[in-house]
């Protein structure tokens, strides 16, 4: 299984925890980001130590054809000291139907949401590939179950 993480990999808590989890399952991971938003070196060292194969690039086209799961993150304005820094990387990756045309037919596109402009709304209509709404729905049920477990264990105390 090849998972590609795309976007702001430096500041995204979800990308850091996801790649750490995946490092226990023999998954190959591609990191695609602008150099200024690359996955932190300490995270890469940690997952490589677990035997994970990683590849870093700033070019999505290099890896989209071999990707099984595309995990897209937004580039957040609040992470930049100036508007100019943000403008330099804003919109550098947009997943749209043209990108999906170069991808595997069974590619799953995930996103932690909310999104800005990194996934074109036209992708929403690709029911098979646009898995982020299913991801959101399942995440709701997971959080409900975790809260129920925590509440039950606190009742026993």
Predicted feature residues:
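Glycine- and other small-residue-rich loops at beta-strand/loop junctions that grip anionic moieties
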Residues: 6-8, 32-34, 89, 112, ...
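Alpha-helical scaffold segments in soluble metabolic enzymes
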Residues: 17, 21-24, 62, 98-102, ...
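Glycine-rich loops and low-complexity Gly/Arg-rich segments
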Residues: 29-31, 54-57, 94-98, 133-136, ...
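Rossmann-like adenosine-cofactor binding region
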Residues: 45-123
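Adenosine-phosphate binding glycine-rich loop
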Residues: 106-107, 112-157
